[in-house]
Amino acid sequence: MVSVELIKNRLQGIATHPTTVLAMSKTELQSVKECVGKSKAESTYQNLCYSDKLLCEFVKDKGIKDIPVTIITEDLFEEYRFYLKKQGLAAATINRYLCWLSRLMYRAVSQRLIRCNPFENTKYEKTEQKIRFLQKNDVAKLMALKVNDKEAEQARRMFIFACFTGLAIADMEHLQYGHIQTAADGQKYIRKERQKTRVEFVVPLHPIAEAIIKHCKAEQEKNGGGQSVKEKGKTETRTDNLVFPCDCSRSVMSAKLSIVGKACGIRERLSYHMARHTFGTMSMSAGIPIESIAKMMGHASIASTQIYAQVTDNKISEDMDRLISKYQKEKVKEEAI
Protein backbone atom coordinates (compact mmCIF):
# COMPACT_ATOMS: atom_id res chain seq x y z
CA MET A 1 0.00 0.00 0.00
CA VAL A 2 1.25 3.51 -0.87
CA SER A 3 1.93 5.74 2.12
CA VAL A 4 0.38 9.18 2.62
CA GLU A 5 3.92 10.58 2.79
CA LEU A 6 4.69 9.28 -0.71
CA ILE A 7 1.46 10.72 -2.17
CA LYS A 8 2.25 14.08 -0.58
CA ASN A 9 5.80 14.06 -1.96
CA ARG A 10 4.62 13.14 -5.43
CA LEU A 11 2.02 15.90 -5.47
CA GLN A 12 4.73 18.35 -4.44
CA GLY A 13 7.16 17.00 -7.01
CA ILE A 14 9.52 15.64 -4.34
CA ALA A 15 11.40 12.41 -5.08
CA THR A 16 14.17 12.06 -2.52
CA HIS A 17 14.57 8.28 -2.86
CA PRO A 18 14.47 5.79 -5.76
CA THR A 19 10.99 4.31 -6.12
CA THR A 20 11.75 1.25 -8.27
CA VAL A 21 13.36 -2.06 -7.30
CA LEU A 22 16.46 -1.95 -9.52
CA ALA A 23 17.13 1.72 -8.78
CA MET A 24 16.86 0.96 -5.07
CA SER A 25 19.18 -2.01 -5.48
CA LYS A 26 21.87 0.19 -7.07
CA THR A 27 21.52 2.79 -4.32
CA GLU A 28 21.73 0.16 -1.58
CA LEU A 29 24.76 -1.39 -3.26
CA GLN A 30 26.49 1.99 -3.40
CA SER A 31 25.91 2.53 0.32
CA VAL A 32 27.54 -0.85 1.04
CA LYS A 33 30.47 0.01 -1.24
CA GLU A 34 31.12 3.18 0.75
CA CYS A 35 31.44 1.07 3.92
CA VAL A 36 34.02 -1.34 2.48
CA GLY A 37 37.17 -1.23 4.58
CA LYS A 38 35.25 0.34 7.45
CA SER A 39 32.27 -1.70 8.61
CA LYS A 40 31.95 -4.01 5.57
CA ALA A 41 34.34 -6.47 3.94
CA GLU A 42 35.13 -6.41 0.21
CA SER A 43 33.78 -9.97 -0.10
CA THR A 44 30.41 -8.83 1.32
CA TYR A 45 30.17 -6.14 -1.35
CA GLN A 46 31.11 -8.59 -4.13
CA ASN A 47 28.44 -11.06 -2.98
CA LEU A 48 25.81 -8.32 -2.98
CA CYS A 49 26.92 -7.23 -6.46
CA TYR A 50 25.94 -10.69 -7.67
CA SER A 51 22.60 -10.41 -5.83
CA ASP A 52 21.99 -7.17 -7.73
CA LYS A 53 23.05 -8.79 -11.03
CA LEU A 54 20.61 -11.69 -10.62
CA LEU A 55 17.78 -9.34 -9.69
CA CYS A 56 18.45 -7.28 -12.84
CA GLU A 57 18.41 -10.44 -14.96
CA PHE A 58 15.12 -11.52 -13.36
CA VAL A 59 13.43 -8.20 -14.15
CA LYS A 60 14.83 -8.28 -17.70
CA ASP A 61 13.47 -11.83 -18.08
CA LYS A 62 10.01 -10.47 -17.24
CA GLY A 63 10.31 -8.17 -20.27
CA ILE A 64 10.25 -4.91 -18.29
CA LYS A 65 12.84 -2.28 -17.38
CA ASP A 66 12.04 -1.95 -13.68
CA ILE A 67 9.32 -2.51 -11.07
CA PRO A 68 7.78 0.25 -8.92
CA VAL A 69 7.97 -0.77 -5.26
CA THR A 70 4.41 0.42 -4.67
CA ILE A 71 2.89 -2.33 -6.85
CA ILE A 72 4.93 -5.23 -5.46
CA THR A 73 3.05 -8.07 -3.77
CA GLU A 74 4.04 -11.42 -2.27
CA ASP A 75 3.62 -12.96 -5.73
CA LEU A 76 6.85 -11.34 -6.90
CA PHE A 77 8.76 -13.13 -4.14
CA GLU A 78 7.47 -16.50 -5.36
CA GLU A 79 8.16 -15.59 -9.00
CA TYR A 80 11.75 -14.71 -8.13
CA ARG A 81 12.16 -17.91 -6.10
CA PHE A 82 10.95 -19.98 -9.10
CA TYR A 83 13.31 -18.06 -11.43
CA LEU A 84 16.29 -18.78 -9.15
CA LYS A 85 15.36 -22.47 -8.93
CA LYS A 86 15.39 -22.64 -12.73
CA GLN A 87 19.00 -21.42 -12.59
CA GLY A 88 19.85 -24.61 -10.70
CA LEU A 89 20.86 -22.82 -7.51
CA ALA A 90 20.95 -24.50 -4.11
CA ALA A 91 18.26 -23.64 -1.54
CA ALA A 92 20.71 -21.79 0.73
CA THR A 93 21.93 -19.70 -2.22
CA ILE A 94 18.36 -18.92 -3.29
CA ASN A 95 17.54 -17.78 0.24
CA ARG A 96 20.48 -15.38 0.16
CA TYR A 97 19.24 -13.72 -3.05
CA LEU A 98 15.67 -13.57 -1.75
CA CYS A 99 16.98 -11.85 1.38
CA TRP A 100 18.44 -9.09 -0.79
CA LEU A 101 15.04 -8.46 -2.38
CA SER A 102 13.39 -8.42 1.05
CA ARG A 103 16.09 -6.06 2.31
CA LEU A 104 15.13 -3.59 -0.42
CA MET A 105 11.51 -3.75 0.71
CA TYR A 106 12.49 -3.01 4.31
CA ARG A 107 14.51 -0.07 3.00
CA ALA A 108 11.41 1.16 1.15
CA VAL A 109 9.46 0.93 4.43
CA SER A 110 12.12 2.95 6.29
CA GLN A 111 11.93 5.59 3.54
CA ARG A 112 8.12 5.63 3.83
CA LEU A 113 7.66 4.58 0.22
CA ILE A 114 5.45 1.70 1.38
CA ARG A 115 3.79 0.93 4.70
CA CYS A 116 5.02 -2.64 5.17
CA ASN A 117 7.24 -5.24 3.59
CA PRO A 118 5.01 -7.39 1.32
CA PHE A 119 7.40 -10.31 1.92
CA GLU A 120 7.34 -10.08 5.71
CA ASN A 121 5.33 -13.29 6.19
CA THR A 122 6.84 -15.33 3.36
CA LYS A 123 8.65 -18.55 4.23
CA TYR A 124 12.19 -19.40 3.23
CA GLU A 125 13.06 -22.97 2.34
CA LYS A 126 14.76 -24.65 5.27
CA THR A 127 18.22 -25.99 4.56
CA GLU A 128 20.29 -28.41 6.55
CA GLN A 129 23.60 -26.75 7.29
CA LYS A 130 26.41 -29.16 6.53
CA ILE A 131 29.97 -28.19 7.21
CA ARG A 132 32.97 -29.63 5.42
CA PHE A 133 36.12 -30.32 7.38
CA LEU A 134 39.22 -32.49 7.16
CA GLN A 135 40.19 -35.43 9.32
CA LYS A 136 43.55 -35.29 11.12
CA ASN A 137 45.17 -37.74 8.69
CA ASP A 138 44.31 -35.45 5.73
CA VAL A 139 45.82 -32.46 7.54
CA ALA A 140 48.94 -34.58 8.12
CA LYS A 141 49.12 -35.33 4.37
CA LEU A 142 49.05 -31.60 3.60
CA MET A 143 51.78 -30.93 6.15
CA ALA A 144 54.01 -33.64 4.64
CA LEU A 145 53.55 -32.46 1.03
CA LYS A 146 56.56 -30.79 -0.65
CA VAL A 147 55.60 -28.05 -3.12
CA ASN A 148 57.95 -26.23 -5.51
CA ASP A 149 55.43 -23.76 -6.94
CA LYS A 150 55.63 -20.53 -4.89
CA GLU A 151 51.90 -19.69 -4.99
CA ALA A 152 50.81 -23.29 -4.35
CA GLU A 153 53.16 -23.44 -1.35
CA GLN A 154 51.67 -20.19 -0.02
CA ALA A 155 48.16 -21.65 -0.46
CA ARG A 156 49.16 -24.86 1.36
CA ARG A 157 50.85 -22.95 4.17
CA MET A 158 47.86 -20.65 4.75
CA PHE A 159 45.43 -23.58 4.76
CA ILE A 160 47.44 -25.42 7.42
CA PHE A 161 47.73 -22.21 9.43
CA ALA A 162 43.94 -21.82 9.33
CA CYS A 163 43.49 -25.44 10.49
CA PHE A 164 45.40 -24.62 13.68
CA THR A 165 44.15 -21.05 14.30
CA GLY A 166 40.65 -20.90 12.78
CA LEU A 167 41.43 -17.69 10.89
CA ALA A 168 39.26 -16.88 7.87
CA ILE A 169 41.02 -16.11 4.58
CA ALA A 170 40.31 -12.37 4.90
CA ASP A 171 41.89 -12.33 8.37
CA MET A 172 44.99 -14.17 7.15
CA GLU A 173 45.34 -11.70 4.29
CA HIS A 174 45.40 -8.85 6.82
CA LEU A 175 47.36 -10.61 9.57
CA GLN A 176 50.36 -8.58 10.75
CA TYR A 177 53.19 -9.50 13.08
CA GLY A 178 51.85 -6.85 15.45
CA HIS A 179 48.72 -8.96 15.97
CA ILE A 180 50.87 -11.68 17.57
CA GLN A 181 51.32 -10.98 21.27
CA THR A 182 52.89 -12.75 24.25
CA ALA A 183 51.11 -13.37 27.57
CA ALA A 184 52.77 -13.18 31.00
CA ASP A 185 53.27 -16.95 31.01
CA GLY A 186 55.11 -16.80 27.69
CA GLN A 187 52.20 -18.19 25.64
CA LYS A 188 51.92 -16.48 22.26
CA TYR A 189 48.50 -15.70 20.82
CA ILE A 190 46.79 -13.76 18.03
CA ARG A 191 44.57 -10.84 18.98
CA LYS A 192 42.75 -9.21 16.09
CA GLU A 193 39.36 -8.00 14.87
CA ARG A 194 37.64 -10.08 12.21
CA GLN A 195 37.52 -8.31 8.86
CA LYS A 196 33.96 -9.52 8.31
CA THR A 197 32.26 -8.60 11.59
CA ARG A 198 34.79 -6.43 13.49
CA VAL A 199 34.37 -8.82 16.44
CA GLU A 200 37.65 -9.31 18.29
CA PHE A 201 39.06 -12.82 18.52
CA VAL A 202 41.87 -14.19 20.67
CA VAL A 203 43.45 -17.51 19.75
CA PRO A 204 46.52 -19.15 21.34
CA LEU A 205 49.28 -19.84 18.83
CA HIS A 206 49.60 -23.58 18.22
CA PRO A 207 53.26 -24.72 17.83
CA ILE A 208 52.59 -25.64 14.18
CA ALA A 209 51.09 -22.19 13.49
CA GLU A 210 54.02 -20.56 15.30
CA ALA A 211 56.48 -22.55 13.17
CA ILE A 212 54.72 -21.30 10.00
CA ILE A 213 54.99 -17.69 11.20
CA LYS A 214 58.71 -18.10 11.97
CA HIS A 215 59.25 -19.61 8.52
CA CYS A 216 57.41 -16.71 6.84
CA LYS A 217 59.41 -14.17 8.86
CA ALA A 218 62.72 -15.80 7.93
CA GLU A 219 61.76 -15.86 4.24
CA GLN A 220 60.76 -12.18 4.28
CA GLU A 221 63.98 -11.13 6.02
CA LYS A 222 65.95 -13.11 3.47
CA ASN A 223 64.10 -11.36 0.62
CA GLY A 224 64.42 -7.90 2.16
CA GLY A 225 61.11 -7.53 4.02
CA GLY A 226 57.44 -8.10 3.31
CA GLN A 227 54.49 -5.98 2.31
CA SER A 228 52.77 -3.50 4.60
CA VAL A 229 49.04 -2.96 4.98
CA LYS A 230 47.19 -0.12 3.28
CA GLU A 231 43.73 0.32 4.75
CA LYS A 232 41.05 1.26 2.21
CA GLY A 233 39.94 4.83 2.51
CA LYS A 234 43.11 5.85 4.39
CA THR A 235 46.24 7.52 3.07
CA GLU A 236 48.60 6.35 5.82
CA THR A 237 50.49 3.09 5.57
CA ARG A 238 51.11 0.97 8.64
CA THR A 239 54.65 -0.25 9.13
CA ASP A 240 53.86 -3.75 10.44
CA ASN A 241 54.53 -6.33 7.75
CA LEU A 242 51.98 -8.86 6.59
CA VAL A 243 52.58 -12.43 7.70
CA PHE A 244 51.24 -13.76 4.38
CA PRO A 245 52.12 -11.26 1.63
CA CYS A 246 50.68 -12.34 -1.70
CA ASP A 247 50.99 -10.89 -5.19
CA CYS A 248 48.15 -12.93 -6.72
CA SER A 249 44.38 -12.74 -6.32
CA ARG A 250 42.30 -14.82 -3.93
CA SER A 251 40.79 -16.75 -6.83
CA VAL A 252 44.27 -17.79 -7.98
CA MET A 253 45.12 -18.89 -4.43
CA SER A 254 41.90 -20.93 -4.27
CA ALA A 255 42.77 -22.62 -7.57
CA LYS A 256 46.27 -23.43 -6.30
CA LEU A 257 44.79 -24.81 -3.07
CA SER A 258 42.55 -27.12 -5.09
CA ILE A 259 45.62 -28.47 -6.93
CA VAL A 260 47.40 -29.03 -3.61
CA GLY A 261 44.42 -31.01 -2.30
CA LYS A 262 44.37 -33.25 -5.38
CA ALA A 263 48.12 -33.83 -5.04
CA CYS A 264 47.47 -35.14 -1.52
CA GLY A 265 44.73 -37.47 -2.73
CA ILE A 266 42.01 -35.55 -0.88
CA ARG A 267 38.73 -36.11 -2.70
CA GLU A 268 36.86 -33.03 -1.53
CA ARG A 269 37.75 -29.67 -3.04
CA LEU A 270 39.70 -27.69 -0.46
CA SER A 271 38.61 -24.20 0.58
CA TYR A 272 39.91 -21.86 3.26
CA HIS A 273 36.56 -21.98 5.02
CA MET A 274 36.98 -25.75 5.24
CA ALA A 275 40.21 -25.12 7.17
CA ARG A 276 38.30 -22.88 9.58
CA HIS A 277 35.69 -25.61 10.06
CA THR A 278 38.50 -28.10 10.64
CA PHE A 279 39.80 -25.94 13.48
CA GLY A 280 36.31 -25.74 15.00
CA THR A 281 35.71 -29.49 14.91
CA MET A 282 39.21 -30.38 16.16
CA SER A 283 38.84 -27.91 19.04
CA MET A 284 35.46 -29.35 19.99
CA SER A 285 36.77 -32.93 19.77
CA ALA A 286 39.68 -31.94 22.04
CA GLY A 287 37.17 -30.98 24.74
CA ILE A 288 37.67 -27.21 24.56
CA PRO A 289 34.57 -25.42 25.97
CA ILE A 290 32.22 -24.02 23.34
CA GLU A 291 32.50 -20.50 24.84
CA SER A 292 36.28 -20.57 24.36
CA ILE A 293 35.94 -21.78 20.76
CA ALA A 294 33.46 -18.96 20.04
CA LYS A 295 35.98 -16.42 21.36
CA MET A 296 38.85 -17.94 19.42
CA MET A 297 36.85 -17.95 16.18
CA GLY A 298 35.43 -14.46 16.69
CA HIS A 299 31.80 -15.60 16.50
CA ALA A 300 29.36 -12.79 17.28
CA SER A 301 26.90 -15.39 18.57
CA ILE A 302 27.59 -18.74 20.24
CA ALA A 303 24.89 -20.20 17.97
CA SER A 304 27.46 -20.11 15.14
CA THR A 305 29.77 -22.29 17.23
CA GLN A 306 27.15 -24.86 18.22
CA ILE A 307 27.23 -26.48 14.78
CA TYR A 308 30.66 -27.93 15.66
CA ALA A 309 29.17 -29.56 18.75
CA GLN A 310 26.50 -31.12 16.53
CA VAL A 311 29.13 -32.43 14.10
CA THR A 312 31.15 -33.93 16.94
CA ASP A 313 28.05 -35.60 18.43
CA ASN A 314 27.19 -37.07 15.03
CA LYS A 315 30.74 -38.40 14.67
CA ILE A 316 30.54 -40.07 18.09
CA SER A 317 27.20 -41.61 17.12
CA GLU A 318 28.61 -42.93 13.82
CA ASP A 319 31.68 -44.38 15.56
CA MET A 320 29.45 -46.08 18.13
CA ASP A 321 27.24 -47.52 15.37
CA ARG A 322 30.33 -48.99 13.69
CA LEU A 323 31.48 -50.46 17.00
CA ILE A 324 28.08 -52.06 17.64
CA SER A 325 27.96 -53.39 14.07
CA LYS A 326 31.45 -54.90 14.46
CA TYR A 327 30.45 -56.51 17.78
CA GLN A 328 27.28 -57.99 16.24
CA LYS A 329 29.26 -59.47 13.32
CA GLU A 330 31.77 -61.06 15.72
CA LYS A 331 28.91 -62.48 17.79
CA VAL A 332 27.34 -64.04 14.69
CA LYS A 333 30.73 -65.63 13.84
CA GLU A 334 31.04 -67.09 17.35
CA GLU A 335 27.52 -68.54 17.17
CA ALA A 336 28.29 -70.04 13.76
CA ILE A 337 31.38 -71.75 15.16
What are these regions (language model features)?
Residues 160, 164, 170-171, 256-259, ...:
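C-terminal catalytic core of tyrosine-transesterase DNA break-rejoin enzymes
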Residues 219-238, 323-337:
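C-terminal secondary-structure termini that scaffold catalytic or DNA-interacting sites
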Residues 54-58, 67, 75-78, 86-120, ...:
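N-terminal DNA-binding recognition helix of tyrosine site-specific recombinases/integrases
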Residues 95-97, 114, 119-169, 173:
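Basic, Lys/Arg- and aromatic-enriched nucleic-acid-binding interface segment
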Residues 195-214, 227-232, 236-259:
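C-terminal catalytic core of Y-nucleophile DNA break-rejoin enzymes
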Residues 129-132, 138, 174-215, 231:
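Conserved tyrosine-mediated DNA breakage-rejoining catalytic core shared by Y-recombinases
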Residues 133, 194-198, 297-322:
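Catalytic-site neighborhood detector that most strongly recognizes the C-terminal catalytic loop/helix
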Residues 179-186, 267-268, 288-307, 318, ...:
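Short, polar N-cap/turn motifs at the start of nucleic acid-interacting alpha helices
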